[in-house]
Amino acid sequence: MRTNTNSAITTANAKKLDGKNIYVAGGTYLIADQEAGLKIEYSGYSKQVEIKVVGGYDPQSTRKDLSKRDPVRYLTTFTGDANNNGIADAGDYSLFTLGNQIDITFEGCTFSCGYHPNEKINGYSGGFLIANGSSGNATLQLNHCIIEKCYNAGVNGSGEAGGSGIFMYKGTAKLNHVQLRNNKASSRGGAIRVNDSGSILFMNNCSITGNEGGQFGYAIQMSNGHLCMNNTTVTNNSGRDGTINGAGSMLIVNSTIIEDGAQNSGAVIRCESWPARQSFLMNNIILNKNADKPVIEMSGSDERHLTSKGYNLVGGTIIPVSTNKFTTSEFDKYNSMISSLNVVWDANRSVYTWDGNVNEFTRTTADAVKNAITTGFKPDSCPFQNLGEEFGKWLEEVDAFSTDQLGNPRDKNAMWPGAYQK
C-alpha cells in the first residue's frame, strides 16, 4: 500500500471518515511518496474527525473475516524506508503529519524508518509531527504500538532538531502500551520532543529504550508543554544532559528510569520547570549508574522547582546539593551509593526491580497516587484547568492501576516503587 497523494484526506471526505475504523492486514506499507510524509487534516470541519486504524489481520481474511487478528503474527508496519535498506537515511520519507481537526487512533501497528532531513522545513519528525494550527486540534492515540528506527537529522541546537519518533509542535498525544526504541536525533529528544505550552503528552505502560538524542533530553525533551507518565520504563538510552529534560511540566509516577554510565553523561532527569508548572515525582525508581554524574539536576534560575511527593528510590547525587529547587520527602530513599538501594536486574523478565527490605521502605497505595495526580497537578499555560484530573480519568479508562508494566497484578495497598510489582 502506498498513499500517492493527499487527495483522499480532504474536508469533503471528513463526514464519510468520521467515526470509522480502518482494518489493515499484516504487511509492510510505504506510507507516502514525499519527504513530508502523509498529512492528515480537516481544517474547517466542525469537529475533530475521529478515525481508528487497527492492524494485525491475516492477509488471507481481507474483506472476509475480522476475527482473524494476531498483531504479533501478522505484523502491520508503516514505513518511510523508500530506499529499502532497513535504516532511516537520505532518500527516505517522514511518516505522518497531523494537522487541524484530526483525532486518529492506531492499534497494533509498528512505525519504522521515518526520516526527516536536516535541510528541510516541511516536517519536524521522522515518525509523527503533531501540529494543529489556530483553527483546530490534533490528537494522536497509540495503543499497543511500536515506533522504531526513526531519525530526525535536524541541526543540533535548531528548533527543528529532535523528536524523531514524535515531535509535538502543538497538539495532544496519548500513548498506552507503546514501545519507542532505537530512534535517533542530533539533539533534543531522541524519541519525543514537546515544543508548545498547549501540548499534552499522556503515557501509560510505555517502554523507551535504545534511543539516541545527543544532548538535552536524549529520550524525551520537554521544551514546553506537559508530560504525564505512569507505569513506564526509560532505560538504555544514550546522550547527555538528561534522558528526560526541559522546562515543561512533568508528572512522573510508578515509573522506572535508569540510565547506565557507559551510555550517557549528565543527569538522568534535568529539570528547568517553573513552580507554577507544579512538576512532581512519586513512587519511582530513578538511578544514574554513572557515579560521577547527578541523578537529578535542577538547572536554570533559582525559581525553578521540582517536588517529590514521596516513595521514590533515588540513586545518585542531586545538584545543586544545597537548594530550594528540589523538595524532598521523608518517604523517599536517597543514596549516592546506588548498590545500597537494592535495585537489581531481573534477567528472566528483562526489568529492573527493587529487592530491598520492605520494612526499610514505606510503600504507598494506589489511592494515594491517584489522589496526588488528580488534586496536585494543575500546571499553568495548560488547556485544562486541572490536567491531573484529566490524566486520572484517562488512566482509569485504560485500567492503569490494576497491573504493573508486565501485566502482573499490583498490590493496591502496598505498591512497589517503579513500574513493576515484585
Go through each PLM region and give its residues.
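Acidic glycine-/aspartate-rich tracts in secreted/extracellular proteins
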Residues: 27-30, 56-64, 82-83, 111, ...
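Right-handed parallel beta-helix/beta-spiral solenoid domain characteristic of secreted/periplasmic
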Residues: 48-119, 151
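Acidic Gly/Asp/Thr-rich repetitive segments characteristic of extracellular carbohydrate-active
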Residues: 1-25, 30-39, 406
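Surface beta-loop-beta hairpin patches that serve as ligand-binding interfaces in beta-rich domains
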Residues: 367-370, 374-422
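Predominantly extracellular beta-rich ligand-binding scaffolds that present long acidic/polar faces
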Residues: 19, 32-51, 62-69, 130-134, ...
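Beta-rich catalytic cores
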Residues: 92, 124, 162, 188, ...
